[in-house]
A protein has these predicted regions:
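Extracellular calcium-associated, cysteine-rich motifs in secreted modular proteins
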Residues: 1-181
């Protein structure tokens, strides 16, 4: 906000970053949250604006903006399948990077689908990156199953048609998600 806007439009103090003392800068209140930078509790619900959780992800708006630099209106900033709060509080991953350990798998897929560690490229320390592993033995890597074919990396035959997902993709040319393709 420029000084004129602060004084004339919002009745805030140009030399004070957070006029109402709610933990959010005046500019963020106006441009991101559409809250009133002169009133601590814009909506009058008894929760000051900085403590609100606009996206209901478990992190306060002030925490998202001031600590993690994430958008308090977006529940999963990096679209990896984990909420920003899950990344920060549970898995200790980066809520702005979908693949924190850079192994070719989204953090959410590692934590919720494969049960691998989204902070370690090679969770079982066998020399193969988690994204290159093929735990179901179907001939497709975890990364291919999750990122390319949308098949189940824990199922040898995702559509239960008697052909492995890898055979359908690499040999037969059928759809590993459609039993009759």
């Amino acid at each position: 906000l420029n000084d004129g806007q602060e004084v004339n439009n919002y009745k805030t103090k140009p030399l004070v970053r957070d006029t109402d003392g709610d933990g959010l800068s005046d500019g963020v209140e106006v441009s991101v949250l559409n809250s009133n930078p002169s009133i601590k509790d814009t909506d009058g619900d008894g929760i000051i604006d900085g403590n609100e959780d606009t996206d209901s992800d478990g992190l306060s708006d002030a925490h998202e903006i001031n600590v993690h630099n994430t958008n308090p209106k977006v529940i999963d900033m990096d679209e990896d399948g984990l909420t920003d709060a899950q990344e920060v509080n549970t898995y200790k991953t980066d809520p702005k990077v979908s693949d924190t350990d850079k192994d070719g798998l989204r953090d959410g897929d590692e934590a919720l689908v494969l049960n691998t560690d989204p902070l370690k490229k090679d969770s079982n320390e066998d020399g193969t990156l988690d994204g290159s592993e093929d735990p179901d033995g179907d001939g497709l890597s975890n990364a291919d199953e999750l990122n390319t074919y949308n098949t189940d990396p824990n199922a040898f035959d995702s559509d239960l048609d008697g052909l492995s997902d890898g055979d359908e993709v690499n040999s037969v040319g059928t759809n590993p998600l459609a039993e009759e393709s």
